[in-house]
């Protein structure tokens, strides 16, 4: 190949070379398990949500008198509209399932530790953006649960000292949840997924700066292989399993993860007996309800994300992987069970004994983050698998 042909070769073009560097030739530890495939699955979920959302927006009308009927029009009259809506609605649930598994994998293998602090913090920001996007999207069908969920959650901003009431009025566009609120939420719901794409690309770039963690929790530049074709084929297994799982929900149980009250048009004069958010908000909602004071509940929610953001900056542990930390491993599984319990409590009425159980579960949730720095310094177990760098430096960083 001549010098001129080399200059104009496809491999030399900036866009292709970047894709080749991050998606094809990117080196990964050879011992990665299937738990490392949820990042790519999250990307697939985000693409599904954006594509289906754009087509749904073509037929949706953001007006309080027309929104509910426009959703029914999509379901009944638009060609393939039912499939678009069920893919979008259940796709949100799949997205959160994948991301929750991704987060818990990071907690189990301490993927947040140095030098990947920025990767973890970006992931927490992405998680927060997902919650905001999903919440305002849940309002758009303008059913009973949409309307009253928007009323309850947005009114929480009034707990902010001095400016709280002003923020609530600004969010509503008036003195109650109404047409201005719906228009604002529709605009934001269309915008935020593209911000999520940008944040995800930053997350990926930050990850590739230092490379992925591995099940052993030790650093090595020696035993690595290219993403393509090895991990592409490995991830492909997860993609197929995900497609089957996703299809079961779409075609056989499309409304199971929703709430039947949302098939009733919004009525400001009739309050549902029990206001429940989508299932993926339930653990956080349970923490919010476990504190009777509104300001305390809002502070607890803020503390959830502050705890996640602060996790990488605790004192570094001797060994990252929970495979060699039996005490932390036991506490981790208790945390997982606690989060499932919080999810169940979140959909129960605000009465005894559910309130008490929610308070105990919320206490343990925060206790986990409080004792994690201590657990990082006890139960030291040295892996038998050393890399050349570990021998040379005597560290597991």
Swiss-Prot record:
Belongs to the cytochrome b family. It comes from the Eukaryota. Heme 1 (or BL or b562) is low-potential and absorbs at about 562 nm, and heme 2 (or BH or b566) is high-potential and absorbs at about 566 nm. GO terms for molecular function: metal ion binding; ubiquinol-cytochrome-c reductase activity. One of its GO terms (biological process) is mitochondrial electron transport, ubiquinol to cytochrome c. The chain crosses the membrane at residues 38-58, 82-104, 119-139, 185-205, 231-251, 295-315, 327-347, 354-373. Pfam families: Cytochrom_B_C, Cytochrome_B. This is Cytochrome b. A ubiquinone binds at residue 208. The main subunits of complex b-c1 are: cytochrome b, cytochrome c1 and the Rieske protein. CDD domains: cytochrome_b_C (cd00290), Cytochrome_b_N (cd00284). Its main location: mitochondrion. Binds 2 heme b groups non-covalently. It is a multi-pass membrane protein. It is found in: Mitochondrion inner membrane. Component of the ubiquinol-cytochrome c reductase complex (complex III or cytochrome b-c1 complex) that is part of the mitochondrial respiratory chain. The b-c1 complex mediates electron transfer from ubiquinol to cytochrome c. Contributes to the generation of a proton gradient across the mitochondrial membrane that is then used for ATP synthesis. Heme b b562 binds at residues 88, 189.
């Amino acid at each position: 190949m001549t010098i001129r042909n080399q200059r104009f070769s496809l491999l030399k073009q900036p866009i292709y070379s970047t894709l080749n560097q991050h998606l094809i030739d990117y080196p990964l530890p050879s011992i990665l398990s299937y738990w490392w495939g949820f990042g790519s699955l999250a990307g697939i979920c985000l693409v599904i949500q954006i594509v289906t959302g754009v087509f749904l927006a073509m037929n949706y009308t953001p007006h309080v008198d027309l929104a509910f009927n426009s959703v029914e029009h999509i379901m009944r009259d638009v060609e393939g509209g039912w499939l678009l809506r069920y893919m979008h609605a259940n796709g949100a649930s799949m997205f959160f399932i994948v991301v929750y598994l991704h987060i818990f994998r990071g907690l189990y293998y301490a993927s947040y530790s140095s030098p990947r602090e920025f990767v973890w913090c970006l992931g927490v920001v992405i998680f927060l953006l997902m919650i905001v996007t999903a919440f305002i999207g849940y309002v758009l069908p303008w059913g009973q649960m949409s309307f009253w969920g928007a009323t309850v959650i947005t009114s929480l901003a009034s707990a902010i000292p001095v400016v709280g009431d002003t923020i609530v009025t600004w969010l509503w566009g008036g003195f109650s949840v109404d047409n201005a609120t719906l228009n604002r939420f529709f605009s934001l719901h269309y915008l935020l997924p593209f911000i999520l794409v940008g944040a995800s690309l930053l997350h990926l770039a930050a990850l590739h700066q230092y490379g992925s963690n591995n099940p052993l929790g030790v650093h090595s530049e020696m035993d690595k292989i290219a993403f393509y074709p090895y991990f592409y084929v490995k991830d492909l297994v997860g993609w197929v399993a995900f497609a089957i799982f996703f299809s079961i929900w779409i075609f056989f149980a499309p409304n199971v993860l929703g709430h039947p009250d949302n098939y009733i048009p919004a009525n400001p004069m009739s309050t549902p007996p029990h206001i429940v958010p989508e299932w993926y908000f339930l653990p956080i909602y349970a923490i919010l309800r476990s504190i009777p004071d509104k300001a305390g509940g809002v502070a607890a929610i803020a503390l959830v994300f502050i705890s996640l953001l602060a996790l990488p900056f605790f004192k570094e542990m001797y060994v990252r992987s929970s495979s060699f930390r039996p005490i932390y491993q036991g506490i981790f599984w208790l945390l997982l069970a606690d989060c499932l319990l919080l999810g169940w409590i979140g959909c129960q009425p605000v009465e005894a004994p559910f309130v008490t159980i929610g308070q105990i579960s919320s206490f343990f949730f925060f206790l986990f983050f409080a004792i994690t720095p201590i657990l990082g310094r006890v139960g030291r177990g040295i892996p038998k698998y050393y890399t050349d760098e570990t021998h040379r430096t005597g560290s597991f960083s």
